Amino acid sequence: MRHLIFLLALTTFAHPCFAEDQAAAGARIYAENCSTCHGDDLVNNAHIAFDLRRLKADEHDRFVNSVLHGKNKMPPWEGVLDAGKIEALWAYVRANAYQ
């Protein structure tokens, strides 16, 4: 069921204008929840967290899984960030990732 929700979210967020709005919302969510460990620009120069700029477009599932369930020292965000917020974060990360 969770995967169905994310698939529906993906199709909803496919329009470019919506993606820009999502990226702006994602920037706010990132600043509030992620920047402490991942840094202001998606990378922590102390190397204590993954460089999010390295995520490729085909790594959406990896990103969602890591956010929901945590990874290494990263805590799980399931129950804290809903599907819409996670998709907004993804839009922000992809808008600022290496091409």
Where are these regions (language model features)?
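Short sequence/structural segments immediately N-terminal
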Residues: 23, 27-31, 81, 98-99
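Short pre-active-site segment immediately N-terminal to redox-active cysteine/selenocysteine motifs
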Residues: 30-36, 41, 70
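Positively charged n-region of N-terminal signal peptides that target proteins for export
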Residues: 1-4
